Amino acid sequence: MSVLVKEVIEKLRLDIVYGEPELLEKEINIADITRPGLEMTGYFDYYTPERIQLLGMKEWSYLISMPSNSRYEVLKKMFLPETPAVIVARGLVVPEEMLKAARECKIAILTSRAATSRLSGELSSYLDSRLAERTSVHGVLMDIYGMGVLIQGDSGIGKSETGLELVKRGHRLVADDRVDIFAKDEITLWGEPAEILKHLIEIRGVGIIDVMSLYGASAVKDSSQVQLAVYLENYDTHKTFDRLGNNAEELEVSGVAIPRIRIPVKTGRNISVVIEAAAMNYRAKEMGFDATRLFDERLTSLIARNEVQNA
């Protein structure tokens, strides 16, 4: 996985101060960025030139305070062929020595009016998501009441049909058939569609449907956090399914675990409504409202009262 410099420019709306077309095609392979503070003093041990170099007010002020020849020399040491680009934040004026060094070393110089901390956060978040290792899973990813719900199950059980019904009920399709999932951080999973399948859903007997064309832009979403997994399986009278919601099960992807529930599919059951309820119930639990715990408390209280009455 890699990101091109021109993609970063487009995403963060950066201005190009210097950058030939071929320089904007440079690949970025590391999500980390560097704010070169010590490097400007001449200390280059552990310097990582493969990262994007971000200069804020502190770095810029120190650079401007240096004599012109020293400024040029330190920038020449910083700007190496493997450096993807240099970004100057806060709309600060790029020194002539920086432009000279960039031309000689063939490195794009970019600027942004955004504050350094904000720009750093946006850039890191974007690179983390783009460069994260993807895991492809079979299923349908839906945005239900603002929650990312991954619907899985055996082939032919009705995942896509359920997704289409959820779209008709006002929810949004993120991905059908193949969902590319990546860990945005240690506790968060995100999912997105394969580019070739974006906004498309396959219904047996009908064919491929362009959800955006049929239902509008409000019916689709380019990516979503994956917060809950729902596994559809055929109803089996010999199998016990969770009736109280107290049997915790998890799905682990890329080292991150999310809760998973199993829903038996049976003729006459409205699976889309059940999944809606599951999503709302999960959100209620996250907010501290647990119906299972409430039922358990009521049952315990009832048993205690009966014991007192029968004593």
From Swiss-Prot:
Record region (Important for the catalytic mechanism of both phosphorylation and dephosphorylation): 201-210
Pfam families, A to Z: Hpr_kinase_C, Hpr_kinase_N
UniProt binding sites for Mg(2+): S160, E202
Keyword Ribonucleoprotein in record: no
Binding site for ATP: G153, D154, S155, G156, I157, G158, K159, S160
Cofactor: Mg(2+)
Active site: H138, K159, D177, R243
Single Gene Ontology BP annotation: regulation of carbohydrate metabolic process
Region (Important for the catalytic mechanism of dephosphorylation): 264-269
UniProt family annotation: Belongs to the HPrK/P family.
Domain comment quoted from the record: The Walker A ATP-binding motif also binds Pi and PPi.
Summary of the function given for this chain in its UniProt record: Catalyzes the ATP- as well as the pyrophosphate-dependent phosphorylation of a specific serine residue in HPr, a phosphocarrier protein of the phosphoenolpyruvate-dependent sugar phosphotransferase system (PTS). HprK/P also catalyzes the pyrophosphate-producing, inorganic phosphate-dependent dephosphorylation (phosphorolysis) of seryl-phosphorylated HPr (P-Ser-HPr).
Protein name as annotated: HPr kinase/phosphorylase
Gene transcribed to yield this protein: hprK
